[in-house]
């Protein structure tokens, strides 16, 4: 066996290997012994046909094709060792020719990360003030959630809840036909057609109304675009929303912890502030990681992106499946996008995640941010604080190698982000240098 070609580009090595005739013959003998037990040959019991007869029966070309499974994996591994290549993942092997017996292998190599001067990274974290209007909006939402619905003896208004009979066609074909349909009259509603709610305003219970709506040419659902829906609607019942009175009693009923409406508003403010702070922190950290990646030299094998891409697509499919109402709807949505479309869509995200993971991982090892055993044990104690009688059982679970390993990764990521966050929040370098110059001038003037 000899390596006839070897190339290393970035994080991938490529080799071409030619097997000598002796190795091929030894391999063919092994292939013969494996296959002869499976193939029925006239005139011989299974497994007893001589090799020359067997080879004529199945053909030498077939034998050489089967030989690939018998000798290529081992030969590839030996060639990698002989060339002192350190693979990061399983090589991808392809046959070049079977006569002579030549194969090629693409071998992923470990990623390489050279960090930039990360101590110069600076970023600004947004501060968001919660306005009274924002709190008013949430309070209004809570009021509507606690509202009751009462029958109204009047024409339909926006915001009403209707019970109605609907008959309709779409370009003459049956469309939406319901005997008892509940419908919330909203100006922004687009179902069953854009502007449908507006046609219901001023209708009176018991009196039918007919109208038509043309779907816009650029409608999101192509099967509806440009078509005309003809409706006949009879309102059976009109209900109007009755909001509870907004006072201290309402706040206390909502949560016994609140004695006043002010306390409810304060809790809403705190919750909104927490969410906004979390968003600001996430945006801040995204800026930092992006800067770290941009200033660093990061090279990685394609297999890392492929693995991350597979995981992202799997997560998206699971999320999609959980949000649809039926398997048929799920299949219909899948039919609108090919695997290639999904790979193209999510590839940039996969590449960003790989680069981010490698850059932060390198930073963690450079600054020795991997937690020690004491830190991991302390975190486990926090996690099992509320476990009660099952503390020891929970502790044993967290100390299982795989679970403890994930916890170490989590703590490492947390410490690494805290480290780089602190750097990024320092004053801008220009300001620090300017201050140093001023101090130096002051000292000279004092002399």
Curated annotation (Swiss-Prot):
InterPro entries: PPIase_dom_sf, Trig_fac, Trigger_fac_C, Trigger_fac_C_sf, Trigger_fac_ribosome-bd_bac, Trigger_fac_ribosome-bd_sf, Trigger_fact/SurA_dom_sf. SUPFAM superfamilies: FKBP-like, Triger factor/SurA peptide-binding domain-like, Trigger factor ribosome-binding domain. Its EC number is 5.2.1.8. Keywords: Cell cycle, Cell division, Chaperone, Cytoplasm, Isomerase, Rotamase. Disulfide bonds: none annotated. Its main location: cytoplasm. It catalyses: [protein]-peptidylproline (omega=180) = [protein]-peptidylproline (omega=0). GO terms for biological process: 'de novo' cotranslational protein folding; cell division; chaperone-mediated protein folding; protein transport; protein unfolding. GO terms for cellular component: cytoplasm. The keyword Isomerase applies. It is found in: Cytoplasm. The keyword Manganese does not apply. It comes from the Bacteria. GO terms for molecular function: peptidyl-prolyl cis-trans isomerase activity; protein folding chaperone; ribosome binding. Residues 159-244 form the PPIase FKBP-type domain. Belongs to the FKBP-type PPIase family. Tig subfamily. Involved in protein export. Acts as a chaperone by maintaining the newly synthesized protein in an open conformation. Functions as a peptidyl-prolyl cis-trans isomerase. This is Trigger factor. The lineage of its organism: Bacteria, Bacillati, Chloroflexota, Dehalococcoidia, Dehalococcoidales.
């Amino acid at each position: 066996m000899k390596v006839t070609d070897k190339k290393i580009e970035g994080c991938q090595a490529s080799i071409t290997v030619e097997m000598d005739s002796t190795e091929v013959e030894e391999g063919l003998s092994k292939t013969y012994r494996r296959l002869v037990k499976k193939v029925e040959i006239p005139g011989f019991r299974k497994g007893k046909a001589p090799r020359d007869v067997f080879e004529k029966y199945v053909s030498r070309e077939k034998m050489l094709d089967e030989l690939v499974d018998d000798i290529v994996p081992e030969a590839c591994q030996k060639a990698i060792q002989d060339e002192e290549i350190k693979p990061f993942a399983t090589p991808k092997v392809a046959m070049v020719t079977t006569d002579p017996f030549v194969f090629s292998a693409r071998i992923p190599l470990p990623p390489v990360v050279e960090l930039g001067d990360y101590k110069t990274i600076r970023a600004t974290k947004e501060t968001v003030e919660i306005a009274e209007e924002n709190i008013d909006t949430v309070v209004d939402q809570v009021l509507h959630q606690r509202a009751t619905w009462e029958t109204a003896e009047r024409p339909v208004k926006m915001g009403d809840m209707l019970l109605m009979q609907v008959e309709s066609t779409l370009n003459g074909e049956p469309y939406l036909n319901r005997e008892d349909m509940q419908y919330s009259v909203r100006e922004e509603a687009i179902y069953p057609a854009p502007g449908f709610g507006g046609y219901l305003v001023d209708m009176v219970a018991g009196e039918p109304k007919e109208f038509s709506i043309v779907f816009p040419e650029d409608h999101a659902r192509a099967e509806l675009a440009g078509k005309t829906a003809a409706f006949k609607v009879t309102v059976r019942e009109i209900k109007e929303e009755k909001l509870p009175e907004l006072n201290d009693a309402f706040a206390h009923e909502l949560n016994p912890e609140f004695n006043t409406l002010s306390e409810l508003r304060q809790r809403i403010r705190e919750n909104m502030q927490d969410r906004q702070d979390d968003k600001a922190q996430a945006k801040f950290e995204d800026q930092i990681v992006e800067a770290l990646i941009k200033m660093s030299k990061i090279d990685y094998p394609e297999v890392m992106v492929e693995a991350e891409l597979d995981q992202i697509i799997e997560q998206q499919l699971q999320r999609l499946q959980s949000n649809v109402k039926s398997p048929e709807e799920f299949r219909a949505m899948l039919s609108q996008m090919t695997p290639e479309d999904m790979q193209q869509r999510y590839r940039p995200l996969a590449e960003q995640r790989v680069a981010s993971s490698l850059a932060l991982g390198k930073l963690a090892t450079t600054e020795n941010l991997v937690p020690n055993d004491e830190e991991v044990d302390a975190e486990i104690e926090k996690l099992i604080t509320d476990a009660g009688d099952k503390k020891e059982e929970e502790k044993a679970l967290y100390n299982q190698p795989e679970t403890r390993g994930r916890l170490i990764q989590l703590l490492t990521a947390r410490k690494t982000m805290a480290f780089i966050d602190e750097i990024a929040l320092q004053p801008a370098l220009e300001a620090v240098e300017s201050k140093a110059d001023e101090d130096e001038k002051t000292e000279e003037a004092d002399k």
